[in-house]
């Protein structure tokens, strides 16, 4: 998917990119590749691949679960790495107020510089493990939306993300193909942490055979105080 095809696909979903937005994606690609030479941010470096598997992939929730992206919504991105999905979402939806949580300082330095280069406002960077941030009252149950892309299995991911979602808000997981087993496996965790599965959408990225699953979970009750548990515990002993 080259930049022109990217723009065309977005227009099919009623997103007409301004010159500024086109330029932001172009700069994003350029800076990602530049920094990736000395900081390990991504294995995907070819322009068409970045536009498809990073940029387009990141914005699929906007047209799959568009109804939850209210103007001025607060969004927390857990383990964003090189800024996916939150930075592409922010470029397309500038009213979003974004908080990015990542445990690696090098990635956050990249993101800090990227945000400046792209001229983005209302983006906060938090250095820490999701388990610790989820127990911090500055962030716990404060967000309308929490996203995570390819971070961990649903049973683990729910414990990272749901404590950050405010009651009535949503957790959006961007997964690969055939996430059915993961969802079954993660059902207990969703219940325990106060979430309820609303929708699961399977899609294929355009001009490719790349299959994806998007999962939408609503926070229907508060997360018990003991969650998230200590850093490392959710991965070692997922809720079952």
Swiss-Prot record:
This is Ribosomal RNA small subunit methyltransferase G. Its EC number is 2.1.1.-. S-adenosyl-L-methionine binds at residues 79, 84, 130-131, 149. It is found in: Cytoplasm. The gene is rsmG. NCBIfam families: rsmG_gidB. Keywords: Cytoplasm, Methyltransferase, rRNA processing, S-adenosyl-L-methionine, Transferase. It is an enzyme of class 2 (transferase). SUPFAM superfamilies: S-adenosyl-L-methionine-dependent methyltransferases. Specifically methylates the N7 position of a guanine in 16S rRNA. One of its GO terms (molecular function) is rRNA (guanine-N7-)-methyltransferase activity. The lineage of its organism: Bacteria, Bacillati, Bacillota, Bacilli, Lactobacillales. It comes from Lactobacillus acidophilus (strain ATCC 700396 / NCK56 / N2 / NCFM). Its main location: cytoplasm. One of its GO terms (cellular component) is cytosol. Belongs to the methyltransferase superfamily. RNA methyltransferase RsmG family.
């Amino acid at each position: 998917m080259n930049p022109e095809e990217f723009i065309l696909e977005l227009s099919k979903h009623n997103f007409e990119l301004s010159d500024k937005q086109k330029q932001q994606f172009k700069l994003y690609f350029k800076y990602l590749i530049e920094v990736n030479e000395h900081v390990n941010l991504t294995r995907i470096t070819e322009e068409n691949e970045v536009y498809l598997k990073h940029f387009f992939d990141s914005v699929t929730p906007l047209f799959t679960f568009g109804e939850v992206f209210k103007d001025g919504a607060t969004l927390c991105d857990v383990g964003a790495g090189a800024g996916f999905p939150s930075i592409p979402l922010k470029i397309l939806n500038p009213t979003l107020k974004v908080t990015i949580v990542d445990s690696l300082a090098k990635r956050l330095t990249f993101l800090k510089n990227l945000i400046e280069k792209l001229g983005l406002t209302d983006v906060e960077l938090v250095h820490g493990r999701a388990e610790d941030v989820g127990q911090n009252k500055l962030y716990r149950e404060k967000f309308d939306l929490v996203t995570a892309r390819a971070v961990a299995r649903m049973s683990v991911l729910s414990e990272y993300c749901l404590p950050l979602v405010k009651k009535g808000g949503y957790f959006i997981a961007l997964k690969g193909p055939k996430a059915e087993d993961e969802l079954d496996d993660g059902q207990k965790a969703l219940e325990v942490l106060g979430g309820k599965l609303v929708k699961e959408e399977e899609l294929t990225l355009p001009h490719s055979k790349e299959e994806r699953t998007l999962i939408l979970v609503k926070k229907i009750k508060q997360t018990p105080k003991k969650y998230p548990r200590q850093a490392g515990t959710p991965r070692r002993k997922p809720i079952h």
